[in-house]
């Protein structure tokens, strides 16, 4: 024991090595934010990005959404080359746009076009939250307004899937103007009898929820979608009250009369086809409400 006091101690210690874990390539697996289950992304995509364990509706890329609701091969895109600029000279904005284009494969946060759904022709707009969180800038507003005007000219219904964090701050008042522009286009469309179906997905917030997203003849939503204008914390601080746990969810809005239905993604195409069939009239009225 006393000898140990004079023995020079080692300056290092052996650390047992952990067995090497096989590396999983990025994107192969997806973790559900609700139930925390990890699943193959391929299986999730096959299930329309609905969690196989708990039914949570994961965000769906715009082109996957279009494939899931329109008849195969019927989609024809509008204004595919339209891209945002930096009108206010906002620092770093162009670089962020370019990064999102590489990541998402899209030029902007919305894809618009026309196609058929169970044989019914329509114009469609699908927002994608992977591009600038689906925020609405000048190009998003312009593409949606143009799609509405084409639906008006060709006497087709207009269908939109919304997913957005609201107006795009890097474009200032120009982004806020899109609320009025899109709403005005829809008002002209509606006055002439046009059928507008809005499907709100997670999340639909800010200026998008306060404008075109809520103007549908039919306002639908996916289960669990967050829908609202201001954030929960801001509202609680303003009204000085604790809000219900399910506040601003699709189910809460349905219960309070702000939605017509909450529809599971697996049933959405069928339900939309029923609505279109109900309103598909003959003669000059065509595909109109009247």
From Swiss-Prot:
<dbReference type="InterPro" id="IPR034733">
    <property type="entry name" value="AcCoA_carboxyl_beta"/>
</dbReference>
<comment type="similarity">
    <text>Belongs to the AccD/PCCB family.</text>
</comment>
<keyword id="KW-0863">Zinc-finger</keyword>
<keyword id="KW-0275">Fatty acid biosynthesis</keyword>
<dbReference type="GO" id="GO:0016743">
    <property type="term" value="F:carboxyl- or carbamoyltransferase activity"/>
</dbReference>
<feature type="binding site">
    <location>
        <position position="54"/>
    </location>
    <ligand>
        <name>Zn(2+)</name>
    </ligand>
</feature>
<dbReference type="GO" id="GO:0005524">
    <property type="term" value="F:ATP binding"/>
</dbReference>
<keyword id="KW-0276">Fatty acid metabolism</keyword>
<dbReference type="Pfam" id="PF17848">
    <property type="entry name" value="Zn_ribbon_ACC"/>
</dbReference>
<keyword id="KW-0862">Zinc</keyword>
<keyword id="KW-0808">Transferase</keyword>
<keyword id="KW-0443">Lipid metabolism</keyword>
<dbReference type="Pfam" id="PF01039">
    <property type="entry name" value="Carboxyl_trans"/>
</dbReference>
<keyword id="KW-0963">Cytoplasm</keyword>
<keyword id="KW-0479">Metal-binding</keyword>
<feature type="zinc finger region" description="C4-type">
    <location>
        <begin position="32"/>
        <end position="54"/>
    </location>
</feature>
<keyword id="KW-0444">Lipid biosynthesis</keyword>
<keyword id="KW-0547">Nucleotide-binding</keyword>
<feature type="domain" description="CoA carboxyltransferase N-terminal">
    <location>
        <begin position="28"/>
        <end position="290"/>
    </location>
</feature>
<feature type="binding site">
    <location>
        <position position="51"/>
    </location>
    <ligand>
        <name>Zn(2+)</name>
    </ligand>
</feature>
<dbReference type="InterPro" id="IPR000438">
    <property type="entry name" value="Acetyl_CoA_COase_Trfase_b_su"/>
</dbReference>
<dbReference type="GO" id="GO:0009317">
    <property type="term" value="C:acetyl-CoA carboxylase complex"/>
</dbReference>
<dbReference type="GO" id="GO:0006633">
    <property type="term" value="P:fatty acid biosynthetic process"/>
</dbReference>
<dbReference type="GO" id="GO:2001295">
    <property type="term" value="P:malonyl-CoA biosynthetic process"/>
</dbReference>
<feature type="binding site">
    <location>
        <position position="35"/>
    </location>
    <ligand>
        <name>Zn(2+)</name>
    </ligand>
</feature>
<dbReference type="InterPro" id="IPR041010">
    <property type="entry name" value="Znf-ACC"/>
</dbReference>
<comment type="subunit">
    <text>Acetyl-CoA carboxylase is a heterohexamer composed of biotin carboxyl carrier protein (AccB), biotin carboxylase (AccC) and two subunits each of ACCase subunit alpha (AccA) and ACCase subunit beta (AccD).</text>
</comment>
<protein>
    <recommendedName>
        <fullName>Acetyl-coenzyme A carboxylase carboxyl transferase subunit beta</fullName>
        <ecNumber>2.1.3.15</ecNumber>
    </recommendedName>
</protein>
<dbReference type="GO" id="GO:0003989">
    <property type="term" value="F:acetyl-CoA carboxylase activity"/>
</dbReference>
<feature type="binding site">
    <location>
        <position position="32"/>
    </location>
    <ligand>
        <name>Zn(2+)</name>
    </ligand>
</feature>
<comment type="pathway">
    <text>Lipid metabolism; malonyl-CoA biosynthesis; malonyl-CoA from acetyl-CoA: step 1/1.</text>
</comment>
<dbReference type="InterPro" id="IPR011762">
    <property type="entry name" value="COA_CT_N"/>
</dbReference>
<comment type="function">
    <text>Component of the acetyl coenzyme A carboxylase (ACC) complex. Biotin carboxylase (BC) catalyzes the carboxylation of biotin on its carrier protein (BCCP) and then the CO(2) group is transferred by the transcarboxylase to acetyl-CoA to form malonyl-CoA.</text>
</comment>
<keyword id="KW-0067">ATP-binding</keyword>
<dbReference type="GO" id="GO:0008270">
    <property type="term" value="F:zinc ion binding"/>
</dbReference>
<dbReference type="InterPro" id="IPR029045">
    <property type="entry name" value="ClpP/crotonase-like_dom_sf"/>
</dbReference>
């Amino acid at each position: 024991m006393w000898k140990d006091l004079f023995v020079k101690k080692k300056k290092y210690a052996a650390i047992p090595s952990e067995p090497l874990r096989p590396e999983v390539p990025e994107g192969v697996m997806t973790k559900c934010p609700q139930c925390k289950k990890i699943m193959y992304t391929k299986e999730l995509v096959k299930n329309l990005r609905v969690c196989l364990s708990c039914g949570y509706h994961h965000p769906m890329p715009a082109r996957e959404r279009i494939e899931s609701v329109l008849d195969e091969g019927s989609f024809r895109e509008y204004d595919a080359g339209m891209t945002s600029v930096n009108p206010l000279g906002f620092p770093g904005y162009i670089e962020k746009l370019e990064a999102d284009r590489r990541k998402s494969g899209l030029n902007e946060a919305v894809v618009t076009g026309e196609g058929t759904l169970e044989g019914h022709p329509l114009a469609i707009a699908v927002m994608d939250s992977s591009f600038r969180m689906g925020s609405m800038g000048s190009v998003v507003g312009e593409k949606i307004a143009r799609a509405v005007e084409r639906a008006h000219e060709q006497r087709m219904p207009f269908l939109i899937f919304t997913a957005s964090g609201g107006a795009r701050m890097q474009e200032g008042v120009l982004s806020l103007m899109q609320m009025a522009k899109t709403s005005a286009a829809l008002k002209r469309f509606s006055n002439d009898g046009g059928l507008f179906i809005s499907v709100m997905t997670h999340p639909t917030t800010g200026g998008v929820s306060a404008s075109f997203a809520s103007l549908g003849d039919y306002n639908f939503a996916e289960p669990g979608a967050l829908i609202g204008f201001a954030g929960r914390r801001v509202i609680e601080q303003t009204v000085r009250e604790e809000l219900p746990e399910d506040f601003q969810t699709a189910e809460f809005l349905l219960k309070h009369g702000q939605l017509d239905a909450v529809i599971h993604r697996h049933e959405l195409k069928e339900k939309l086809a029923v609505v279109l069939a109900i309103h598909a009239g003959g003669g000059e009225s065509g595909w109109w409400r009247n």
